[in-house]
């Protein structure tokens, strides 16, 4: 990364942080202030079956369709920050329509495993200045952990090679389309299986895949946290058994 790119990277991070700090200050004073950020789990269906994923990968009763999501987006305050996720958000029918409605009045992030990305879809995203972050889930070099977790996927190497190409294409096209403030992010779930390779994963994401940012995330402490299905209210008082890392010292 050049010095100029590094300075730009720092500047947008500072602006993002300052904007959130300003909103937090306002939230303490203003009554009935709507949230600034929203995470929409468009579907809990997914084209993968990773054993460490907390989502229920079956269609839930009462799940919203694209028309209902679009109607919901119309009720949110202008200039919100919307994250579209899943499951695999690109798997929902009419995803492009949901995205288009989102970026009309809001900033938009997308979290995806990347397998359904295409050049046409990336161009479609990057034409919108309100599209801010594309996040790809990567748990080790070549995402071999996900290959092992999805043994029925016989063409994993070919499909992951496609994702790598799409990420590099994304970085090239955002410059060509003058949308360089859009961020290519990578997210890694910290597991015992990848605990010896965390620095190598970071190098893979930043150096090989040219990601602008890379973050690590731990497994949830409670199944209720960030859940995509309903619990009874009193369940919040029940003791839950968090995952215990065997290689915590290494991590």
Q: What is each residue range found by the language model?
A:
Residues 2-132:
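Conserved alpha-helical substructure of the radical SAM core
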Residues 1, 62-64, 132-251:
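Radical SAM enzyme [4Fe-4S]-AdoMet core and its adjacent flexible, acidic
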């Amino acid at each position: 990364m050049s010095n100029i790119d590094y300075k730009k990277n720092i500047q947008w991070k500072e602006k993002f942080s300052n904007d959130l700090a300003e909103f937090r200050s306002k939230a303490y004073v203003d009554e009935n202030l709507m949230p600034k950020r929203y995470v929409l789990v468009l579907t809990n269906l997914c084209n993968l079956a990773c054993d460490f994923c907390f989502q229920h990968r079956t269609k839930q009763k009462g799940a919203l369709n694209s028309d209902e999501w679009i109607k919901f987006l119309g009720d949110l305050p202008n200039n919100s920050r919307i994250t579209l996720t899943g499951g695999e958000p690109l798997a929902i029918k009419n995803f492009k329509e949901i995205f288009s409605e989102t970026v009309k009045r809001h900033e938009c992030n997308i979290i995806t495993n990347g397998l359904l990305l295409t050049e046409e879809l990336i161009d479609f995203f990057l034409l919108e200045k309100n599209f801010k972050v594309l996040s790809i889930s990567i748990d080790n070099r070549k995402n071999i952990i996900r290959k092992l977790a999805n043994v029925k996927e016989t063409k994993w190497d070919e499909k992951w090679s496609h994702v790598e190409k799409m990420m590099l294409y994304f970085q090239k096209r955002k410059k060509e389309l003058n949308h360089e403030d859009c961020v290519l992010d990578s997210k890694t779930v910290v597991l015992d299986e990848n605990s010896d390779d965390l620095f190598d994963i970071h190098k893979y994401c930043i150096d090989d895949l040219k990601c602008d940012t890379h973050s690590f995330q731990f497994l949830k402490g409670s199944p209720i946290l960030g859940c995509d299905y309903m619990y009874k209210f009193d369940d919040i008082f029940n003791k839950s058994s968090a995952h215990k890392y065997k290689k915590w010292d290494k991590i």
